[in-house]
Amino acid sequence: MPGLHQNAWVVGERSSKLKVFGPEGIDQFTQGIEMAYAHDYVFRNEHHGDAIAPLQFAGFDTRVIDLNNPVIFDNGELKITAFKVIHEPIEPALGFRFEYKGRSIVISGDTSYTQTVIDNSMNADVLFHEAQANHMLAIMEESLRSRGADLLATVLDDITTYHTTLVEAAEIANEANVKKLFFYHLTPAPRNYIQEIMFVRGVDQVREEWTLVEDGTLVILPVGSDEIIVTNM
C-alpha cells in the first residue's frame, strides 16, 4: 500500500487522493502511512513541482465500509459489495464481490470456512479463495518441535484455526455453484511440482474446476460471454 499510493501519485498522473475502502480501522492505517510519508510528500513536491507531485493529491481519501450498507460502489455497470468473513481475532474481516455487465468475481479475503462466502458467491463466474494445506503445516510443526523450535511450531498450529483448507474451499465453491475456483494466498506456498501435488491433496475428489494461482496469474471474463480466460501477466 505505501508504494502503491506513492507511485500512483508521482508517476500515475492522479487527479485526486487515492480512494481506499476498508473496514473500521482503515482510517488509522492510512493516516499512519500519511504520517510516515509527510516529509517525503514535501521533498518530492519541491524537487519535481506541482505538475508531477501536486501536494493536494498526496495521500488517501479513506472510506470506512458500513456493513449495514455493504454496496461500496455502484455506477450502473460495476458493482462492488463487501461482506463479513471469519478471521478472528481480526474483526471485522471482509470479502468482496465484483459484478460487471453480467460477469462476477468473488474474493474471499482471509477467512476460515464461513457461510457468508457461500451466500455471496452464488452462481459467480470466479471465486478466488484463500487456501491453506493444514496437512503440510502439521509436518512442518512436527519437524520444528523435534528440533526444539516450539515457539515457531506453536505459530504454525495457531494459524490452522483461522484459514480455510483447499478441500473446504472446494466445497464452498460447489455449494455456491461457482463456475471456476482459484486458490490464492497459499499457505505454505508450494515451491516446486512435488510440493504442489502435496498441497492440493484431496481437491480432485471434491471438485474438477480449479486452478492454483501463481504470481502474475491473470483471469479475464469477456463481457457477453461465459468464457473464462486464464493467462499470465
Where are these regions (language model features)?
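Binuclear metal-dependent hydrolase catalytic cores
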Residues: 1-106, 112, 193-232
